[in-house]
Amino acid sequence: MASIRQAFVKSLRFYDIGYNATDPVFRGIYHEKLKHPDDFDSIISRAKAVGVEKMMITGDNVENSEEALNLATNYECFTSTVGVHPCQAQCFLRHSEGPEDYLVKLEALANKGKASGKVVAFGEFGLDYDRLHYAPADVQKMYFEEQLKVAVRVQLPLFLHSRNAENDFFAILEKYLPELPKKGVVHSFTGSIDEMRRCIEHGLYVGVNGCSLKTEENLEVVRAIPLEKMLLETDAPWCEVRPSHAGHQFLKTKLPFDSCKKERFKEGCMIRGRNEPCNTYIVAEIVAALKDISLEELSEQIWENSINLLSK
């Protein structure tokens, strides 16, 4: 792998700010069934081979955030987040000891993780009005605001989720941003140019992954994001760049790894349909083409952005 890195990426370095590393598919488990051997460490090796030096593991509830922190503690290349995803907002109401106790546990975990140096952002949290069947809007809004209060007390930058909820999202968020010097990032951004500019005006970074590169309209938004306010991510195992995506036409490089179906697993192969952090390189190559700059220039600026937001 070291020789691949030397030949393939030279001086490039990337920080995948959205890796759902606690998902069982990274252990070979799909829909609760083991389909192939655990290849977790191979995924990390592939990422490092193409210059992905850091990966932030995202948490989406208390239990999952604790698992993310445990992983981050055991791997130097990992950092993590603590938070409750809007689609899991019902966790607060379903908790056997009540929502207040769930918030207490969330804050304690965030403080513990921050003290260890491994938890570098609060989230993933926000609003998702595309999937109200998981949690109604009133519950999402209530616990978006309650979590913002926790984030202010803990003083962590925000790792935010916003889907089809722009006005409510900013109405709640802007009450707390003045108390958060580093602000945060709206990850997996798929909104309009106007919404993107609203993020920038609020001091937020914008996270770009394969889902940000699906349509021509998406590409116009990515072109318009100021480079100094952009971060890159995969949101693996989801949001891979597919041949049907508008951004796919800008790809020039094939990563130096074989791929296989999960049912025909081979050691060292990427699993088809399972996104992973090494594909940060793919996202970066498309964005560099859209921006008409070199991959080296893009890599260095995005790395600087990532460190500015996610380090002490």
Curated annotation (Swiss-Prot):
Signal peptide boundaries: none
Locations listed in the record: Cytoplasm; Nucleus
Source taxon at top rank: Eukaryota
Pfam family, one: TatD_DNase
Cellular-component GO terms for this entry: cytosol; nucleus
Cofactor: a divalent metal cation
Main subcellular localisation: cytoplasm
Gene3D superfamilies named in the record: Metal-dependent hydrolases
GO biological process: DNA catabolic process
Binding residue positions for a divalent metal cation 2: E124, H161, H187
Keyword line: Cytoplasm, Hydrolase, Metal-binding, Nuclease, Nucleus
Annotated binding of a divalent metal cation 1, by residue: E124, D235
InterPro entries: Metal_Hydrolase, TatD-like, TatD-type_Hydrolase
Molecular-function annotations in GO: 3'-5'-DNA exonuclease activity; metal ion binding
Enzyme Commission code: 3.1.21.-
Family: Belongs to the metallo-dependent hydrolases superfamily. TatD-type hydrolase family.
PANTHER family listed in its UniProt record: DEOXYRIBONUCLEASE TATDN1, TATD FAMILY DEOXYRIBONUCLEASE
Function: Has both endo- and exonuclease activities. Incises double-stranded DNA without obvious specificity via its endonuclease activity and excises the DNA from the 3'-to 5'-end by its exonuclease activity. May have a role in apoptosis.
Protein name: Deoxyribonuclease Tat-D
